[in-house]
């Protein structure tokens, strides 16, 4: 089941001494930070403002844009932004533009009261979500362009640094928000968050734009389409909108492509339902904002970073597909720790133990998952194809999980809710096990194709 040659532990550790990994980390911070603004911070603010669990769950529907960002991903692959493209390049110009929009919306949110202006707050949160989802397209493409399949031995490391960056951008600001929310208020917190957005924009100016054959491959595709349709405008449109999806199915075959899409959709549904209700659960169990900030955000961040590095090393040494299987099983089992905590109550030792187990399993499975998605994308349309796969992976977290509050209310039992989330991963594990050899062959095929690109 291994998908990569065995290397020594020393070689594995030395492989992290690559400056490009720092770039991936810095942009990973930018990717994770908007989830603080419209995720955990907003959930805490809405709960303190007196909104119901169902309302908080439905507010999370703004995350649905992450599930459909592949629809405009072709524009990120092909459209060159005026002025910004010349100075920053294709990937960084889109990232910087999206960060600018996030900054504006964050400043506006800081000046409203969601209890009195829920519609305006929702609209601004939707604006952040759209900008963030678009930014993710460019950031993922930046990582894939920086570490192409010809550098496949570095995929787990790059995935790990992206995950570590994401959790750093999500957890550290989240920690600062929750420990200060009671003293300065949520409006003050969001003004502080705006300053962090400005810092992330500086990061974007510091990283280096990757050099790829993307434009050459796109021009070759455009010439082929131009010969077929006889129009440069139509050829540009078909290459931009249609070719990325045709390329994915041609490269993998229809049956395999559909199987991949279904597996990606199912793999993290249980984790999505758990994550959407976690802050509400912590508060209802009896933990304070300060405790949530310390354990869930600050300690959770450190635990995640450590286990992400461990998980990536294991994936480097033993293979991505095996890592997916182990991570999926552990991820399902870890959800049962939350069911235990629901029965025991606000026990800080159990809270810490649960976070350790949950962060380990989540980090391990995410590194393998991101590496796997990266391997099956093509270089010519990396932004569009990865966005399609990532959108499916996010669909449960961003759309179906909006009903998590309704499910908790219907069950009226947190323990049963968490047991159900543990069972949700089983279908994808069965699929992965039954097709494990086929997935291995697919990864090997993708690695060989790198020499052709």
Where are these regions (language model features)?
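C-terminal transmembrane helical hairpin of 12-TM major facilitator-type secondary transporters
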Residues: 322-369
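Intracellular juxtamembrane helix-capping segments at the cytosolic ends
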Residues: 134-148, 363-378, 388
């Amino acid at each position: 089941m291994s998908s990569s040659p065995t290397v020594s532990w020393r070689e594995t550790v030395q492989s992290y001494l690559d400056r490009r990994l720092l770039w991936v980390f810095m942009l990973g911070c930018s990717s994770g930070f908007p989830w603080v603004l419209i995720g955990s911070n907003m959930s805490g603010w809405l709960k303190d403002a007196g909104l119901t669990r169902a309302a908080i769950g439905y507010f999370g529907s703004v995350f649905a844009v992450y599930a459909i960002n592949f629809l405009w991903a072709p524009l990120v692959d092909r459209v060159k932004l005026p002025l910004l493209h010349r100075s920053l390049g294709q990937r960084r110009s889109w990232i910087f533009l999206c960060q600018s929009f996030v900054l504006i919306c964050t400043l506006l949110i800081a000046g409203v009261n969601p209890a009195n202006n829920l519609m305006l707050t929702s609209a601004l949160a939707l604006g952040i979500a759209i900008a963030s989802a678009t930014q993710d397209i460019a950031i993922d493409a930046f990582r894939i362009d920086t570490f192409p399949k010809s550098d496949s031995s570095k995929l787990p490391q790059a995935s790990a640094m992206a995950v570590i960056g994401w959790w750093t951008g999500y957890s550290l600001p989240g920690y600062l928000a929750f420990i200060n929310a009671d003293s300065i208020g949520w409006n003050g917190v969001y003004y502080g968050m705006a300053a962090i957005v400005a810092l992330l924009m500086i990061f974007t100016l510091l990283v280096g734009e990757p050099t790829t054959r993307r434009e050459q491959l796109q021009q070759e595709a455009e010439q082929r389409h131009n010969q077929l349709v006889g129009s440069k405008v139509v050829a540009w449109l078909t290459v931009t909108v249609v070719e990325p999806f045709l390329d994915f199915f041609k490269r993998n075959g229809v049956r395999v492509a559909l199987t991949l899409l279904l597996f990606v959709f199912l793999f993290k549904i249980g984790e999505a339902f758990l994550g959407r209700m976690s802050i509400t659960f912590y508060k209802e169990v009896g933990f304070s904002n300060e405790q949530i900030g310390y354990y869930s955000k600050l300690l959770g961040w450190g635990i995640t970073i450590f286990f992400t590095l461990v998980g990536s090393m294991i994936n480097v040494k033993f293979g991505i597909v095996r890592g997916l299987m182990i991570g999926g099983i552990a991820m399902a089992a870890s959800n049962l720790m939350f069911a235990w905590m629901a029965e025991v109550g606000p026990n800080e030792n159990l809270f810490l133990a649960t976070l350790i187990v949950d962060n380990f399993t989540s980090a391990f499975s995410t590194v393998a998952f991101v590496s796997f998605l990266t391997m099956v994308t093509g270089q010519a349309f990396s932004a569009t194809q990865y966005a399609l796969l990532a959108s499916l992976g996010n669909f449960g977290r961003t759309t179906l999980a909006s009903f998590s509050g309704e499910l908790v209310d219907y069950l009226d039992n947190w323990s049963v809710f968490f047991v159900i989330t543990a069972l949700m991963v089983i279908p994808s594990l069965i699929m992965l096990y039954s097709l494990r050899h086929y997935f291995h062959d697919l990864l090997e095929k993708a690695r060989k194709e790198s020499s052709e690109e």
